[in-house]
Regions:
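Cysteine/selenocysteine-centered motifs that mediate thiol-based redox chemistry or coordinate metal-sulfur cofactors
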Residues: 3-7, 71-106
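PLP-dependent aspartate aminotransferase-fold enzymes
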Residues: 92-208
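A structural motif shared across PLP-dependent enzymes of the aminotransferase-like
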Residues: 27-37, 52-69, 80-92
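Conserved PLP phosphate-binding loop immediately N-terminal to the Schiff-base lysine helix
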Residues: 180-181, 212-225
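Catalytic PLP-binding core of fold-type I/II PLP enzymes
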Residues: 222-237
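Short beta-strands and strand-loop turn motifs
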Residues: 45-48, 175-176, 210-215
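Active-site-adjacent loop/helix segments that line or gate small-molecule/cofactor pockets in enzymes
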Residues: 1-32
Length: 237
């Protein structure tokens, strides 16, 4: 185990970690269900599902079987100009369980890249309509959307983790984050009015509104009132 840690220190740069002032690391032996088992024999509850990527738990027999079956055929092929049955079946299934207005599936490899692609879609749409000035984005403060350059530009500009890149990022439009559910029940006018004002004032420049679905995660697990999302959708239309 000590050799693993030593080699890790020598060759690996972990995400969200300093290359010089290094945080402790914990070698993992195996994982099952909601648990991570360390080389030391300790058992941990993975309460964040490995950054939300293992929502069905580790070592799920159905997923393991599907992975083993697929790897014996091919692990990966480029998706430009090619297709294959698993991708088509998954896209069809996603289409069946999402709103009718969402008709196509674009596969991506991370949350950051997914948001980045969505931003490009929005800009490209307005460009096709000859409205090339609509290339900026409106979002709420306290948000987190990813670690690529585009997604950093729409994450919280003051208290977020990307402050040091501020002068390198595109400048976007921000409004205050919405009230808590209880505060929204008492008075929903503030956040919606601010959003409406910004949309009216800057509509000629705004390509899209970007917002985390359901809640602001990294920003404090702040859950949106469902009506806020509904009213925001109406404002955008």
């Amino acid at each position: 185990m000590q050799k693993i840690i030593k080699d890790d220190r020598s060759y690996v740069w972990h995400p969200y970690a300093s290359a010089s002032d290094k945080n402790p690391i914990y070698p993992v032996k195996k994982a099952k269900g909601t648990y991570i088992y360390l080389e030391t024999g300790e058992k941990l509850i993975d309460g964040m599902s490995s950054w939300w990527c293992v929502i069905n738990g580790y070592n799920h027999p159905r997923l393991n079987k599907a992975i083993k079956n697929q790897i014996s055929k091919f692990s990966h092929v480029m998706f430009g100009g090619f297709t294959h049955k698993p991708a088509v079946e998954l896209a069809k299934k996603i289409n069946e369980i999402t709103p009718a207005s969402l008709q196509k599936v674009f596969f991506s490899d991370s949350g950051s890249v997914s948001v980045e692609v969505a931003m490009k879609f929005a800009v490209q749409y307005w460009h096709s309509q000859s409205l090339i000035k609509k290339k900026k984005f409106l979002t709420v403060k306290n948000g987190y959307h990813g670690d690529t350059m585009g997604t950093m530009s729409i994450s919280d500009p003051v208290n977020g983790m990307h402050k040091m890149f501020e002068k390198s990022l595109l400048k976007q439009f921000y409004v205050s984050s919405p009230e808590s559910i209880e505060d929204y029940k008492r008075d929903k006018s503030r956040s919606l009015k601010e959003m409406e004002t910004k949309l009216i004032d800057k509509h000629a420049e705004i390509a899209a509104v970007v917002i985390e679905p359901i809640l602001q995660g990294a920003g404090g697990m702040r859950i949106y009132h469902p009506d806020y999302l509904l009213q925001l959708k109406k404002l955008c239309k």
